[in-house]
Amino acid sequence: VEENLRMALLGCGRADRIDDALELFPALKGLLGRKGGVLSGGEQQQLAIGRALLTRPKVLMLDEPTEGIQPSIVMEIEDSIRRIASELGLAVLLVEQYLDFAERLADAYVIMAKGAVVAAGVTSELRLETVKHHLSL
């Protein structure tokens, strides 16, 4: 796992950022010393987020970060994403199929169907009827 993180920094010349990523995303500390091939889906997702943070992005793009992850780990990832975005001032672009997870993290939403935007707005105003209508298209 540590080698995986170091490889993400090649060309960036900032090995000290691994320590920064471990501080920001403590779940990674428990993965150090393990082989990547034995990580669970949730652990792999945590490693992927940690790698993304190493480059200090302005936008963190997450595609289905809860896919195949145990509910207990989903809450850890959600808390970490929220905290990291706040501490680093990151914008988070989230592609997510689970509405409850997306609602808790997002300020705004866009619903797409067949490659087109079919609904958009402020998450606090998102109505279940809107989602159900577009899911049935």
Question: What are these regions, as identified by a protein language model?
Answer:
Residues 1-18, 25-29, 121:
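ABC-type ATPase nucleotide-binding domains, specifically the catalytic core motifs of the NBD
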Residues 35-39, 43:
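Conserved ABC ATPase signature
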Residues 52-53:
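ABC ATPase C-loop
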Residues 56:
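Conserved catalytic motifs of ABC-family nucleotide-binding domains
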Residues 60-64:
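Catalytic Walker B motif of ABC-type/P-loop ATPase nucleotide-binding domains
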Residues 75-88:
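Helical segment within the ABC ATPase nucleotide-binding domain
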Residues 96-97:
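H-loop/switch region of ABC-family ATPase nucleotide-binding domains
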